Swiss-Prot record:
Subunit text: Homodimer.
Source organism of the structure: Phenylobacterium zucineum (strain HLK1)
E.C. numbers: 2.3.1.47
Classification via PANTHER family: 8-AMINO-7-OXONONANOATE SYNTHASE, CLASS II AMINOTRANSFERASE/8-AMINO-7-OXONONANOATE SYNTHASE
Positions in coiled-coil regions: none
Pathway as given in its UniProt record: Cofactor biosynthesis; biotin biosynthesis
GO molecular function, one term: pyridoxal phosphate binding
Keywords on record: Biotin biosynthesis, Pyridoxal phosphate, Transferase
GO BP annotations listed: biotin biosynthetic process
UniProt name for this protein: Putative 8-amino-7-oxononanoate synthase
UniProt function note: Catalyzes the decarboxylative condensation of pimeloyl-[acyl-carrier protein] and L-alanine to produce 8-amino-7-oxononanoate (AON), [acyl-carrier protein], and carbon dioxide.
Family in the record: Belongs to the class-II pyridoxal-phosphate-dependent aminotransferase family. BioF subfamily.
Annotated positions of the N6-(pyridoxal phosphate)lysine modification: 243
Record carries keyword Transferase: yes
Amino acid sequence: MPAPMDSLAAFATDKLAALESQSLRRRLRPTRRTDGVCVERGGRRLVSFSCNDYLGLSHHPAVKAAAAAAIESEGLGAGASRLVTGDNPLLATLERRLAALKGAEAACVFGSGYLANLGIIPTFMGAGDIVLVDELAHACIWGGARLSGAQVISFRHNDVDDLTGKLAAARGSARRALVATDGVFSMDGDIAPLDDISRTAQAWDAWLLVDDAHGLGVVGGGVGVGALFPSARIDLSMGTLSKALGAYGAYVCAAQPVIDLIKSRTRTVVYTTALPPAVAAGALAALDIIITEPKRVAAPRLRARRLTRSLGLPTAESAIVPIVLGDAETALAAAADLERQGLLAVAIRPPTVPANTARLRIACSALHTESQIDDLAAALQPWMQA
């Protein structure tokens, strides 16, 4: 007989104590976003540099009005999965607009970015296949790859030579191959070399999935990272509605038969309630703003570059600037110091980032003023020199 298990509560208590000892325990902190930049937390108003609402559209009057009007006419929730009665016409309209923006034949929306990659990859990959994943790709890509049952192979970050070598070693025995990467990496803000990755994937008869969650609305004139690499063949262009669009959910753009199969067989589409119509309406209004306001689209990167210039860091490629501090304790101390100064920059710790690379992940918004960026740079300087 095996030894009796601890109670579930005792097991959890031990796990939490171990995390606490490593400064890795997470705690929720109630936070209200009062506008596109500032938050209320612990009774204080803080300028936030930890929100992915890159264009400030979650609080844009046109976006809120569109969502409110949809609630009035369509109700709050979808009521069922899309294959039952949840396929509100606003969802198809949003999919057509996303596909047109991305230059794809069709699109499918999802409940979240995590659900998207958790569902997409197992739809196309399985036992006998290989999935090659950038080592710094988002957790949802890793989750979908592992869930698929395919052999999952990590390649060094943005290292096309390493990708080529690993494809060469494994491709011959595999039925199908998929290369999966972030477009803009969520914790570092750098951009994948998609032209070279695409050429390598094609040379080894592999499909390419790109997660453009942090590119849409920010890079490539708002179209996303694919617009920076027009020659790249991206078979599955996935992204979110929850970052620059200021809404919630996700999408994937691809060829029409690919999308048809996703809508028929992907478990995170078939077996879950559809996105609320109001979310689709708000996202549609946000797309209009991205298309018609190029200065707003350019602003987050300009703010990020002002910050990197002030701190003597490499020029920002996106709206994200990592301030890598090393151990978790230092990152937590730096975050607390900034919060005392009225600035919110949440510490990011393992396992979200690799060991010894705990950091403050700075997310710049179109609504940040230059003086707010300068205040942040001044507050960060002592930690850069420590």
